[in-house]
């Protein structure tokens, strides 16, 4: 069955395509597979504070990836109107990481990164901070100036430039600091009915796990949900996510949703995670790189439908081209947009027939016209290659030593010296 994915949302005066099981899947599904006479939702809508998200699916914040352009593309595939919750969204799409210092200083690039499309609801922003006072000030800006409807806090980043300052996945080790930051942002969010969530990892390494204690602390401070990437900082993106940690967190945290993250490469992976852990929803990161239609699959799967997207190469090329156009609108700079799209090209073309010479040329593309010329050389009829186009994508790497501030692991509380260091260690730039 071949359709088109060039217009993920049907026009207002048109009727959406209807799959053979009666599921409205819009015009975004391309070639789709699977049908059945009945649909039974796997999970109820996801409730995050006042927001009701139709499908329990969240786009993970990814530095340098989840800008307004990419969120728009994912939203077109995930939100075709079917199953949207009370907040008008079928999935939740979170911004890339925004550092609180850069926001408080109103850094020009940061202020651009927190902008949303008018139709983007709820407006979701992830904040990174290592200082409660700066975190509070940043949250106050977002709430008092009506710039966000949901705030997520980053306690999961494993990169050295973050952990060496005591931030990201290193921070929950300091119990008092973690609670102070979470509590400050929750308090500011409450002033505007803006719910706050946290995203974290299992811990620093296997000997320094923090997720259960941190999850309970966040729950006590009043967060609206807790998300767990089921790897340690030392694992980074290597190895296999330990979904049993998600199950244990779900058993411990009982008053707010628990979301699972890690190794969701397909809708079937998401369903399996829910079945094995009992989590209330899933957070999808690397699995959607070059596959924004994964959100169509996920929405269908959680609605009880077996419809899946299997686009031909021409449809994939059109999605890539549209992504580049959205980046051009976002940056207001075609050359910069083309430099950005380069990193996505291998993900889009994964498993498809495209020679090394063409791939090399695409990796150097510097204009939309050049991109069009190169994409025109692809065989648009080449079918979806199945397993070769699916599975793991994005960075993986190997386990590594976690770089931490001196003496960080000696005590669970901040020393006066560490408190002074942390207060001056806020990152001054947002994103990737």
Residue spans for each PLM region:
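Alpha/beta catalytic cores of nucleotide-metabolism and tRNA/nucleoside-modifying enzymes
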Residues: 1-53, 57, 63, 210-225, ...
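Glycine-rich, positively charged N-terminal anion/phosphate-binding segment
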Residues: 37-47, 62-145
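N-terminal small/glycine-rich loop or linker at the start of catalytic domains
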Residues: 46-58, 101-122, 157-167, 185-202
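Active-site mouth loops of central-metabolism enzymes
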Residues: 56-66, 122-135, 171-172, 198-210
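Hydrophobic faces of well-ordered beta-strands that scaffold small-molecule active sites
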Residues: 57-61, 93-95, 123-127, 151, ...
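Active-site beta-loop-alpha junctions enriched in small/polar residues
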Residues: 62-64, 98-100, 128-130, 156-158, ...
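A structural motif
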Residues: 79, 90, 147-148, 223, ...
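Alpha/beta enzyme core
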Residues: 84, 136-167, 171-256
């Amino acid at each position: 069955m071949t359709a088109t994915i060039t217009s993920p949302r049907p026009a207002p005066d048109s009727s959406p395509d209807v799959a053979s099981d009666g599921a409205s899947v819009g015009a975004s599904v391309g070639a789709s597979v699977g049908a059945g006479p009945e649909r039974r939702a796997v999970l109820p809508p996801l409730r995050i504070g006042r927001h009701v998200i139709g499908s329990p699916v969240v786009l993970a914040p990814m530095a340098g990836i989840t800008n307004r352009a990419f969120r728009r593309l994912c939203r077109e595939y995930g939100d075709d109107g079917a199953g949207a919750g009370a907040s008008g969204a079928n999935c939740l799409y979170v911004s890339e990481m925004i550092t609180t210092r850069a926001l408080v200083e109103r850094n020009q690039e940061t202020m651009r990164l927190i902008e949303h499309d008018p139709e983007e609801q709820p407006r979701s922003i992830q904040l990174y901070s290592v200082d409660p006072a700066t975190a509070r000030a940043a949250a106050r800006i977002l709430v008092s100036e009506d710039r966000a409807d949901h705030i997520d806090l980053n306690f999961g980043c494993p990169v050295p430039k973050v952990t060496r300052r005591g931030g990201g996945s290193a921070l929950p080790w300091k119990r008092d600091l973690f609670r102070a930051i979470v509590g400050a942002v929750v308090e500011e969010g409450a002033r505007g009915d803006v719910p706050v969530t946290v995203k974290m990892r299992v811990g620093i390494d296997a000997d320094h796990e923090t997720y259960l204690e941190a999850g309970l602390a966040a729950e006590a401070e009043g967060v609206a949900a807790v998300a767990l990437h089921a790897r340690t900082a030392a694992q980074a993106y290597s190895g296999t996510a330990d979904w049993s940690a998600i199950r244990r967190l779900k058993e411990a945290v009982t008053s707010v949703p628990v979301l699972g993250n890690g190794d969701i490469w397909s809708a079937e992976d998401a369903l399996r995670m829910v079945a094995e852990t009992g989590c209330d929803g899933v957070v999808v990161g690397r699995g959607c790189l070059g596959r924004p239609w994964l959100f169509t699959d996920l929405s269908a799967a959680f609605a009880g439908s077996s419809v899946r997207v299997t686009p031909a190469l021409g449809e994939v090329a059109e999605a890539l081209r549209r992504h580049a156009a959205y980046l051009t609108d976002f940056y207001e700079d075609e050359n910069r947009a083309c430099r950005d799209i380069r990193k996505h090209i291998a993900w889009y073309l994964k498993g498809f027939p495209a020679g090394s010479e063409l791939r090399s040329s695409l990796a150097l593309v510097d204009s939309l016209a050049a991109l069009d010329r190169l994409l025109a050389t692809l065989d648009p009829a080449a079918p979806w290659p199945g397993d070769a186009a699916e599975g793991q994508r994005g960075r993986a790497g190997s386990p590594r030593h976690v770089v931490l501030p001196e003496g960080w692991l000696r005590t669970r509380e901040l020393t006066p010296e560490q408190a002074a260091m942390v207060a001056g260690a806020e990152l001054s730039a947002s994103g990737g």
